[in-house]
Amino acid sequence: MTSKKEPPDKYRCLKLPISSILYKDNEEVKENMEILQKAIIRTNAITTKTYFLLRLWVLHKYHNNQEIPEITEDTISMCMKSIMKSASGQKPKGNNAILLEDFRIINTFGLEDGSNLSSILDYYATTMITAIENNIKMRFFDYVKRFVNSFFKHLYQDQIENKEFKKQLYKEINLVKNDIINNTLTCDEKYHSWLKENRYNIVPEIYETSYYYDIKVSPYKYLKHMIFMCLELEKLERKSFQFFPIQTNAIPRHIQVDTKALVELFVDTEQHEKLLDVWITEEKRIDKGKNKGKPKNKTKGDLYNCLEQNKEFIWNTFFNITQTRKNYVFDYTIITDGYATSLRFLHKDFIKEEQNKKDKKKAGKKALQGLSKEEKDKIKEDKKQLQKEQAKKTRLENKDKPKKSKKEEKQENPEFPYIDEVPKEMLEGKHILIDPGKRSLFSMMDDNGKFFSYTNRMYLKETKRLKYQALLKHYKDRIGITEIEEGLNKYNSKTCNIERFQEYINAKIKANETLVPLYQELKFRQYKWYSYINKKRTEDNMVNKIVKKYSKDHIIIIGDWSIGKQMRNFISTPNLTLKRKLQETFKVYNIDEFRTSCLSYKTEEVCKNLYLKFKKDKSQKERKIHSILTYQMENNRKGCINRDKNGCKNIQKVFNYYLETGERPEKYSREYKI
């Protein structure tokens, strides 16, 4: 397999404290930072209520047997408008006016101040659509499986105590889940009537090509099926899921600030009169009255028409940005929470493309000038219809083409190629063989058997994650945040019952009146920043330790283990992040670690866990020691070995065997039955 050269990332961000891009000892800077902090708080308040109101609106549609429409930027814009105090400007017409009225009818919240936030809220609207659609596209099939599991666990809750019954039940309901997702009927006959009754409540009856394809094309038609499953789980009093994302965290979140947002927030017509004269070159004259013919005063509104020409001057007025990135230019956009900020850089290869987009957008706006609202709406609707038709045409053209499997798509340019996907010449040299895990993040060994373990305890100590958690918990307990948040535990944010969700919203918004001012304390954002810095430093230290133990010239062969879902009662641990960090310094190749943990590297027989009794344990029960494996030695005596060392030795064995023969050892292949 020949590796293709990766195209450059379009954007790159540089994260740093916002204080590092501010002019020093400047009173205006302090005033502007106060404006920015208030804008962040106001934006968070608006978006929190918008999520709540949108979810409530969707539930009203469902319970009134109305079709749940596609959620667009217009939908979110009207939802936000219903939450904000009235502002001057053109009133919504047509479909937008109907949407606004719908939201106002169900809105019971206090109104928020949305002045000078239009650009920031536009970005948030896009973020919200992404969050809503991703929740459907990426989690729907997991929710279907969870629903089927919960339903039949409840149905057979008495018999499920029997291990054999439980094993057989899971085997049978796996077929039921596959039948629902693939629209087949291969499960046991006893499930047919249930499937016939519930299938099209769980998934749509009409779909295009397959459910996996259809959900990518039309995600919103799956919302009602998610609500149905939630309501059924509520009836059974089983754990539900969140069919619609909401914003519950009261810590100030990041906002995106571009040139337009900068002008909206910081430029004042009177205060910056001289600057406006410099920035705005076009002269406008008064066309009537006694001052006819005299130059018009330049305003903040005039500046919006020439942002592109003046963006560098505008940013230099308010921020001291001197940071650079090789082959990248500053994109005049920052993402900030008021303490930390990310400067966005655009790759030089994409500058022309982005400029063309802006010119096209500007030309489109110019073409709409002077048209009535109805004419503008018709043009927009025609454009949407044309895009839909073109997308449908493309789908039909691609329908007959042979489809690549996900595996084939990945193989074309994998992030971490497997050892059998690259020429053997690329694997020649010195090797570090790594067995990834939870307790020991990386257990590694070189060709000579030199062993090193990078543990989760080392990672936690260096990142200070537990220390910051404890400090914040103590602080929250002391100022009363914990007590208020515990009071919300009696409400269910996942409920699909309108009355109960309305109760939750009312309680949460009331709690936020106290929580939001408390969470504005910089300490919360500070520790978030410190965690980020420590994480980056820890990753660098990890690589330095590996280089010191071995060398930069080694090739890494790493097991393809991944946890999939977070284990209960075990702290979350990094895997892919650290793997990518290794790739910055080393060549990294995956190896299929099938059976490398359960077979003894010496005898190739199945290992068992060691069980021991502890003197301090009064019950004298034998306890499993997960980190130690036992195996039968050749002299029929029992031997012990560290699980991680055994894994590394097995990976070495499989790798060396592959280099010699191009195959896997027989007992480590999936065809061999143990």
Named regions from a protein language model:
Residues 2-674:
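Positively charged, helix-rich recognition surfaces that bind polyanionic ligands
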